[in-house]
């Protein structure tokens, strides 16, 4: 059984990434399907949880993802060269220069008393309405902002010219994720938070370099959405009760603008804590030997992995969720600040953007190519574990067909709870909560199977679901597992 320490390993909380899987749910797969010294790959590694767990269990890992932001997260996760004491010392220098700049932006003087705002409620047009601050006893209080002071601030903000660099990268138009025509990354921020982020970025560049700078930047990108216009208030809990950025770029009628210095310092503490946790695990102790395995972070297209045939002992992956999460389009908020450019044309995704030719047919073709690559690099009779969540039958068909076409034989399946859920899972009672986890074995023989077309599949699934409901299985998870049992038991 996993200990509470293992379940809450801080190394996996340094940065957001969609669909992050809980280590305690996937770590046992490494012991079950691989040996010490084996080579393990995740072609769509994302945050890199599985690969990190495998590395710490002395497997040689290949951490692959086409998204540069994912590569950067993995680089920080796996780095052993960070000097934490140096990071803390450099932060003192950065904070010394940043503090007055940020305080000038977030200090309000009301009735002769100065307040340092932690969070500010603003209308969509930008007018500040309320703010939170700490009292002398460290209690958080909420105060209204007089209209005259709010108007004066808006005039100051509008006239201000930002002298430090910031990205003005265009966001791909996609109404499904509220990415509208001519929207840029800069539009996701108020002038105040954009100026503060730009100043912080410049000071990181001034005072730090190497692995220490990377750790600052991982905290920086992790904090961007927290201090953007994307933070919604949870009105049922109070005007300044914060929600979290999940997906997309929707800006509500009101949003919460957070103090960049205050929130960055919190994110930096999490990054340092996560790094210390990782370094401690790598070093080992009396109960666990030092890690002696290797890792490699690659930016290959999953449809064309730069690996020899039959060179991998175990594959685990969580492939793209169809149109549920357009990873590259949403990662622009991170990639732009990191000055990284994704290869959008090679992404495996279903996108509702009319600027991209990424529909279900392209998705099915690309998924099949990536699974063919998994088959090519995986040794005969070795194992491949797959997690997938999608409410679309067509996307599940694409995944299933790719497994069939490549002669992967199911040996096990179960339900896996996620560490983080997409909004549709959180907000819909009838949504699937978590992912199907299926493990396949590669058989060397070629396969020649006839598969049903889309209309036949739809009718078969509808009939099967109707029968399951008649039998008393009414929750979505139960129906999904019944489908798995019907189709995949060997």
Language model feature labels by segment:
Residues 36, 340-341, 373, 378-384:
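Short glycine-dipeptide loop
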Residues 345-346, 382-388:
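Conserved beta-strand signature within the Rossmann-like core of class I S-adenosyl-L-methionine
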Residues 364-380, 405:
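A short glycine-rich, Lys/Arg-flanked "PGG" loop and its adjoining helix->strand segment in the class I
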